[in-house]
Structure formats: C-alpha cells, structure tokens
Amino acid sequence: MGKLTLDITMSLDGFIAGPNQTMEQPLGEGGERIHEWVYGLKSWRESHGESGGEATADDEVFAETFSSTGAVVMGRRMFSGGAGAWEDDPNADGWWGDNPPFGVPVFILTHHAREPVTKEGGTTFTFVTEGAGGALAQARAAAGDKNVAVAGGANVVQQYLGLIDEMQIHIAPLLLGDGVRLFGGPERPVLEATRVIESPAVTHIRYRVVK
C-alpha cells in the first residue's frame, strides 16, 4: 500500500486561493498567480494532452508526483465549485475539461450522490457520500501500491491531516494577504523536512509527517 500524500501549492503567506471566490473566479482574486509556475512545464502540458513545455527541475518534481500517484481525493468545490443538488450546479461535470490532468481515479467528497463521470485520459470521477473515511478506502483500493493524493480544498485537507504520511508544499513567491488558508484547523502534526528544491518560480518542500 502506498502513502497518503498532500501535494499542493500555496502563497508565501499560507493561502491556496485568494479572497472572493466565485464560479467565474474559483481561485479567488489573485489565486491563479499561485499556480503560474506549473503551466509551462512539459509534464503539465503532457497531462493535458498538449506538446511542448519546459523540462526544468520544477518539471521533474511535477512528473515525479504524477507518476507515483494512483488515485486522488478532492472536495466538491474543487471539482466543480458548486454545492447542493447536482441539477442546480452549472458545472455538474466539473471544470476540468474533457481530458483532466489526473489520469487516475478521482474520488469526490460530496453530500449528493450521483453516477461516476468518465473522462478522457484515464480519469474517472467517483462521488462518495460516505465521508472522508469512505473516500479514502475507495481511493486506496483503486491506487494499489501507488500513493493516494489529497488534492484539496483546505477543508478536505483538514479532514485528512491526521492521516497524511507525507506533504509536498510548493511555495509560490508571492503574498495574497487574504483568502483561503491551507492550515487553520486544530490539527498540529509534527513535520520533518526531507527535501528542498528551489527555483526562481517556486520552492518545493517535502515533509515527512512524524507519527
């Protein structure tokens, strides 16, 4: 069985999204800037079915994470930005497009049941109403010997924080000042930094969670 991992980008002041999130601006004001480091990478473009891109140290980090992940868990808002009944969600099939960048089974925490949604490239979105434990059990079964990655959002991260084995935080060199904090709940895991990779665009820090 693989590890339960957290792999996520945040601003230098600890935010994973800016303030005033909307359906039209899911990452809030300024939130897109947090992820600018990834858009031009060769492995990122390949995961979207595109060619070209830069083969840098950042690209190696992204590709390594992509290849070691066998399943993903995320929240409803990260999937579509919506809440409530699916028939009332204008992004009911998600805002990840026809060929999402995951290429593995993705399990969505939700209070509203529905049939799975299958996309191109090996991504199937399964909607789990049995809570965080139920989603993790299904994700582990799907991942086999590979890792299960917790993708977000912040509320979902908090639900799994006591179970996560390893974190990789990509710190973007910018300050948002306000928005959605990654860490704000009562859990305070003990962390040991095991790797730091720096580039002008982002700093990648891997932590082992001491248990």
PLM regions with names:
Residues 1-211:
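Enzymes that bind and transform nitrogen-containing heteroaromatic metabolites
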